[in-house]
Amino acid sequence: MAASAKEGGPAGNAAETAPAEEAPSANTEEEEASALEEIVVTATRTPKALKDVPVVTRVIGSDELRKADATNIQDLLTEEIPGLEFGFSMTQETSLSMSGFGGSAVLFLVDGERLAGETMDNVDYNRLSLGDVGRVEIVKGASSALYGANAVGGVVNLISREDTAPWHLDLNSRYSAMGDEWRAGAVLGLSSGNVRSATTYQFSTRRRVNLTDAFDTASSVHNIFGGTTHNIKERLTWNVAPGLKLVARGGFYYRESDRLNYSDRYHDYSGGLRALWNIREGSDLELSYSYDQYDKSRFEGDRRTHDHDYSNRQHILHALFNRILGKLTLTAGADYMHDYLTTYQFAGNGRHLQHTFDAFVQGDYTPVEWFNAVASLREDYFSASRNNAVTARAAAMFRLAPLSIRLSYSGGFRAPTLKELYMDFDMAGIQMIYGNPDLKPERSHNFNVALERMGNIRDGVLRGSYSLTLSGYYNYYDSRITTEDAPGQGDVEAGARYCNEDGVKVCGVDFNVRYRADMGLGANISYNFLHVGGGTVDSQFSQPRPHSATWRLDYERRLGTSYRLLYAALSGRYLGKPESRYPTDGAYSIWKLTLQQSLWRGIAVNFTVDNLFNYRPKIYYWNSAMTTGTTWSIGISIPLDDRL
């Protein structure tokens, strides 16, 4: 990830919305201006004010994180982003669909760093706790010219928050009636001189939830497995000298999923070191090393079965250089990744490794205040498949008051994974699945145009600010990696084999309207239309929906200009009937009522009624809403700091 104060994003925190209890002003025009000046890094890998970014970027800031009252990344994204949906895969691991792309085509980052491990082509989303997150940046569409493989359909970057107070301790706890779920966590920040420490711990536990009975032969899912999760992270920042900063991090993650007569256990060990050096005015250099090891195993009681052992280990070296030359900013970078995988899905629990090299350059040019253009070029090489990929991106923004116009083209690719190249797996006696060493990389071409208008209503009871955004996109997705029937031959059983298929065309429209009145009323409504042509991105786990929407109507009451006393919101999402060759749900909507009450010194109590109108699927498919009807939750957050 780029940055001077950059390291994934904290540079932007200075312009970010302040905590709810200390919001700087109730004046919506000032808040809107602050949001426009918020520094983002994901779209261009260099710090840039949101209003100046030529690529459409959705930012969920700290204030929105509190309003959404989401306990995990899945809830947050589905409540905020139409066209994005989480369901289950065959092993009841979480499966993503976003604008027609599956989880393998969307790159998730934490402070700009990749995550090791996958299950059914998706990362372990339970690793992405929100306890220490300051904001989330989402770029829809291909971004491989900056981020390489997997950024075919988009990038989601979780960026940690920073605090310079001498010390602070944030405690939180939450109970949900569905599955008797308990979540608890703490974030401890310490600062002394040139050194800052941030320690985060998150814990959750949930019982099994019965959705339907075992005699329901039509449903694919009958219950939601229970389990326990622990997530510990440490982040240490040292300002060594003026212009030189070191950031060290480490983390441990453990999850146990309790199945019917066994349990699956997941471990992750991660660490890294980053150096940020402002060489001189207008020049900076970033160097980093990261390590991530993700393991899976199966237990029957206390006995490890060793028939589901899995370990993915990634070592990544990264370098990034920025140079400002007047109105032109040049960026150059390179990465190396050592990717090692051993899994029960290889013959004889075998092991394979891959070396990946890349280099990229970018030019960011702003000749006049109302125009900005960015162009990027990148080449990647993958040793296992002996493939290389060249990708490019070009984007421009015009500010013609009161409109901002953004135009972009971006190329994307996804290299075959080690699993797709070398798999030799008997899927529970159902069929064999074979890898294909001759696979080619998936490629995509994304075109996007967006119009944005922001303004203010200056008189009357509706005085406040608003924004309107309309964007259209077209994706041509070529050489998509999927499976085909493979006839048996000799000692090789018949089964399914990974292959490349013909192109898929995905096009759509996103529309968003936001409004915030000085009196405290607010609205946020988003709609997505999606059309898929050519081939298909349809499966029993991920099915494109032509229509989807999210909304939130809220009211906040402040005491003076700096203390939020009460917050109430009615939010929801609508999912249209999927276009699919498989049996599916019909269209449905789920509504949520949220109440947040501040008590004393920032202590806040949250109460939520979810699925307000008691929706339940008649049949539970893999991508159905996994709900038993109306449920409720209650939580408390307690911030402590040196002002006590």
Question: Where are the predicted features?
Answer:
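Extracytoplasmic beta-strand/coil segments of soluble accessory domains associated
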Residues: 42, 74-113
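Periplasmic-side early beta-strands and strand-to-turn transitions of outer-membrane beta-barrels
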Residues: 145, 157, 164-170, 174, ...
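Conserved C-terminal beta-signal and adjacent last beta-strands/turns
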Residues: 189-191, 226, 239, 363, ...
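Gram-negative outer-membrane beta-barrel transporters
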Residues: 366-373, 467-469, 473-477, 497-578
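Membrane-embedded beta-barrel scaffold of Gram-negative outer-membrane proteins
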Residues: 195, 286-298, 399-401, 405-406, ...
